[in-house]
A protein has these predicted regions:
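Positively charged n-region of N-terminal signal peptides that target proteins for export
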Residues: 1-4
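C-terminal motif of bacterial Sec signal peptides marking the signal peptidase cleavage site
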Residues: 13-16
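Bacterial signal peptide processing site
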Residues: 18-20
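Noncatalytic scaffold domains of N-terminal-nucleophile
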Residues: 23-52, 64-65, 69-177
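Surface-exposed charged/polar residues within alpha-helices that form helix-capping/stabilizing sites
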Residues: 55-56
């Protein structure tokens, strides 16, 4: 009886671990979708509308900082459960001379805030001021080349006219309800 049980378990493991030829064939097919290509730069984001907005800024003559700002604001509109202006960010810029500069868009508490001895679990003591917009504004001031209103125009358009909510974002909204 023990031998039959052992043989059954080993057989199940063998067949469960063997390679699925159909999945292998499907996975080995190259993608025929061209997502983005550029000789000077490109944008990649978690949401195609945000990627398109950043790439359109590059095509209009903007630089990487401009594209990052446009992309960030579109993400805040079209994928607010994962990206937004009400949170924090860190930005790393490689400058033309090869050096790096960082922008810390972390949340902060007011300078006059006196923390309690025990960290609060609820109430105003648990809330900090978002740093995303301040960091993006500083990035723009130091590296941007296009007017701010041009950079946020795509986000305003999607917020005003609407857009198709992708499946993952819809699922996150449904989960929150």
């Amino acid at each position: 009886m023990k031998n039959i049980l052992l043989l059954t378990i080993l057989s199940a493991l063998f067949f469960a671990c063997r390679e699925d030829q159909e999945q292998k064939k499907e996975a080995s097919k190259p993608s025929t979708t061209k997502l983005a290509q550029s000789g000077l730069g490109m944008v990649a984001a978690a949401q195609p509308l945000a990627t398109a907005a950043g790439n359109s800024i590059l095509e209009a003559g903007g630089n990487a900082a401009d594209a990052a700002i446009a992309t960030a604001f579109v993400l805040a509109v079209v994928e607010p459960t994962m990206n937004g202006i009400g949170g924090r960010n860190q930005i790393l810029v490689r400058q033309a001379d090869g050096s790096f500069v960082g922008y810390n868009g972390m949340t902060e508490v007011p300078a006059s805030f006196v923390p309690a001895e025990e960290p609060p679990n609820a109430g105003y003591g648990t809330v900090a001021t978002p740093g995303v917009v301040a960091a993006l504004m500083r990035l723009h001031a130091e590296h941007g080349s296009m007017p701010w209103d041009e950079l946020i125009k795509p986000a305003i358009q999607y917020a005003s006219e609407g857009f198709e909510v992708l499946e993952g974002e819809a699922a996150r909204h449904a989960y929150a309800l």
